[in-house]
Amino acid sequence: MKYHILIVPTALRVLAEIPDRRVQKILQERIDALSHDPEKQGKALTGELAGCRSVRAAGQRYRIIFRIDRGRVMVLVLALGMRKEGDRKDVYVLAKKLLRLRLI
């Protein structure tokens, strides 16, 4: 079954602001690949991001955080960005902040 992909505006903005067009293309291709068997891709997240999944992209540096809505056969891309463990600009830190503020 093929899933429809929906990218939230904040994730679209982050994608558009990546200066390297090759990285943008790789991320877009990885997002498109989520339309086929998204449950088998990436890993399930815990804690504040429970119910979401994360996949690596662009040479393991970037993460794409998404949620699967089986009822509407849709993958909702909530956030994407660089993995910078311990940094306040880390993609997981930003995704948690957006969820707390109910912006995604």
Model-assigned labels for residue ranges:
Residues 4, 13, 67-104:
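Enriched for short, Lys/Arg-rich terminal
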Residues 40-85:
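Basic/aromatic recognition patch in beta-strand/loop cores that engages polyanionic ligands
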Residues 23, 27-30, 41, 45, ...:
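Amphipathic alpha-helical interface surfaces
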